């Protein structure tokens, strides 16, 4: 094990990064105060919220591809239910699981949401779902292998798992180093290289169907915020804090000059970041990736 960033160590065998020491469950709960989730139904400032929803819902045709009419779909860590709402609009039976009521505020009423700190305690029957989505959640969990094993159990034979994570072996991660926005310490307990994630899925009874390296919602912003973090001239992750829709009491305490500089670098940086996102997609090294896997049998 070698140190890579504050509180983060990297396994020299598998390449996975993890917090050391691991926080206790009580400490983990403290990483997610109510304001982390934003106001009910929203997480970002209004114009960003509309953009996030627009881009996110463009993925729904991908998520619903090849599903039979009325198929049961589970979103692990469903949050505000953006994915579930769009899938419900397409006639699917949607389910979600979250760690707290605060996390799921604003979720679509058509979704059956279960509140459980661990997926294994949510009480789903074996083979119940045709598809399970775990979108930028696996890295937050203290037992990722156990969660993947539980997903395998509750999927029907031939059922599909779609999992998205930051790619710890990506060009963006290597260039950014400890300044990488997608590290998100200490909330991300694990950092997965793509090849290690695929190996984990294969070892738990899945076959890899496809991998995808392009994310307009995640990857360009990661370039901009990571570059600002590297410069150390502005608050760490300050741009994200500026765009986040927190309560008034919890708003980022930036003065006018700092806010203007953050907005300036957002406007200037996005075009180059989009180009870099295209490049990392071409070389199959997306800053965030999603993998489609199928349960054998």
Segments (PLM) and residue ranges:
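A short hydrophobic/small-residue beta-strand
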Residues: 94, 161-162
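A C-terminal cap/extension of S-adenosyl-L-methionine-dependent methyltransferases
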Residues: 1-3, 215-297
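A short glycine-rich, Lys/Arg-flanked "PGG" loop and its adjoining helix->strand segment in the class I
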Residues: 145-160
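Short glycine/proline- and charge-enriched loop/turn segments
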Residues: 37-47, 176-185, 225-231
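Short catalytic micro-motifs in class I SAM-dependent methyltransferases
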Residues: 135-142, 164
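Conserved N-terminal segment of class I S-adenosyl-L-methionine
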Residues: 1-135, 144-149, 213-214, 238-239, ...
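Short, glycine-/aromatic-enriched active-site segment of Class I SAM-dependent methyltransferases
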Residues: 163-191, 195-202, 214-218, 223-225
């Amino acid at each position: 094990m070698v140190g890579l960033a504050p509180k983060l160590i990297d396994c020299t065998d598998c390449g996975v990064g993890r917090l050391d020491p691991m926080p206790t469950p009580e400490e983990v709960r403290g990483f997610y105060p109510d304001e982390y989730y934003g106001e009910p139904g929203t997480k970002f400032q209004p114009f960003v919220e509309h953009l996030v929803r627009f881009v996110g819902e463009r993925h729904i045709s991908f998520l619903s591809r090849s599903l039979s009419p009325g198929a049961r779909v589970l979103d692990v860590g469903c949050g505000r239910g953006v994915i579930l709402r769009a899938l419900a609009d397409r006639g699917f039976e949607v389910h979600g699981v979250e760690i707290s009521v605060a996390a799921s505020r604003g979720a679509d009423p058509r979704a059956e949401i279960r509140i459980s700190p661990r997926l294994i305690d949510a009480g789903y029957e074996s083979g119940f779902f045709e598809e399970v989505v775990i979108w930028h959640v696996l890295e937050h969990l203290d037992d990722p292998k156990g969660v993947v094993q539980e997903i395998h159990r509750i999927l029907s034979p031939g059922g599909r798992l779609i999992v998205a994570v930051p790619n710890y072996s990506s060009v963006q991660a290597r260039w950014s180093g400890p300044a990488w926005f997608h590290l998100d310490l200490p909330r991300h307990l694990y950092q997965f290289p793509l090849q290690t994630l695929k190996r984990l899925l294969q070892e738990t009874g899945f076959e890899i169907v496809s991998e995808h390296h392009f994310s307009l919602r995640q990857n360009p912003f990661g370039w901009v915020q990571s570059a600002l973090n590297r410069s150390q001239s502005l608050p760490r992750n300050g741009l994200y804090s500026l765009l986040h829709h927190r309560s008034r009491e919890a708003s980022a305490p930036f003065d006018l000059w700092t806010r203007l500089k953050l907005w300036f670098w957002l406007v200037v940086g996005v075009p180059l970041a989009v180009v870099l996102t295209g490049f990392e997609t071409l070389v199959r090294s997306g800053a965030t990736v999603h993998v489609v896997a199928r349960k054998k049998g």
